[in-house]
């Protein structure tokens, strides 16, 4: 039976401010990426999210981003050196590892967030710095990378275990990059459309661009953003469609 991982970005509230329905999304995901305090999240939210994931048998990963709470980590931060990027990534991974130990759970993977990921997909220095930080913290951590990107090449060069990611609810350009969130249609919202799209991604090993071009991509994990309106309904629809197609859902990290 074909198996695929479903991952969600969670723990992205801050203090009294909540983002998304983490408890519901954890019931539908097999892996979650937890904000580590820079673009969102705090120690209490991190621990609560880890506890929910452990109770649900869901793998957890660090979701490091630029230090930009106001912009939710979706704005590039210019002028950072490779060492500064390594520091901010290692800092955030370590924070989640420490909090996870309180809940008796283990961090299995790392996925860069927002603008940090977007920049790294096109900039070798940023991509290599992220990979170097992960390797320095724990060379066994799985590096979640966007297919056909510089992040992928950096992870390969560093010798890290990799999980190739595609996005259920994001549109793709013909060059396999994500359509900018500033453009209309960048984020998809129709649960039925997204569910059918994910099944095709897994079965065909390809995504369809905004112009209708089929782009071959290895697919180890499919991301559904927890902050997308209707995220729970989207995730539920994807799970149901995968089941109907005979595709099992399981963590890429092996549980």
UniProtKB/Swiss-Prot annotation:
Catalytic activity: 5-oxo-L-proline + ATP + 2 H2O = L-glutamate + ADP + phosphate + H(+)
InterPro entries cross-referenced by the UniProt entry: Glyco_hydro/deAcase_b/a-brl, LamB/YcsF/PxpA-like
GO function terms (MF aspect): 5-oxoprolinase (ATP-hydrolyzing) activity; ATP binding
EC class of the enzyme, as a word: hydrolase
CDD domains to which the protein is assigned, alphabetical: LamB_YcsF_like (cd10787)
Gene3D superfamilies the UniProt entry points to: Glycoside hydrolase/deacetylase
One GO process term, biological-process aspect: carbohydrate metabolic process
Catalytic activity, EC: 3.5.2.9
Pfam entry (one): LamB_YcsF
Record bears the keyword NAD: no
Keywords, comma-separated and alphabetical: ATP-binding, Hydrolase, Nucleotide-binding
Residues annotated as signal peptide: none
Family listed: Belongs to the LamB/PxpA family.
Subunit structure: Forms a complex composed of PxpA, PxpB and PxpC.
Function as written in the Swiss-Prot or TrEMBL entry: Catalyzes the cleavage of 5-oxoproline to form L-glutamate coupled to the hydrolysis of ATP to ADP and inorganic phosphate.
Record PANTHER family: 5-OXOPROLINASE SUBUNIT A, UNCHARACTERIZED PROTEIN YBGL-RELATED
Official protein name in the record: 5-oxoprolinase subunit A
Name of the gene: pxpA
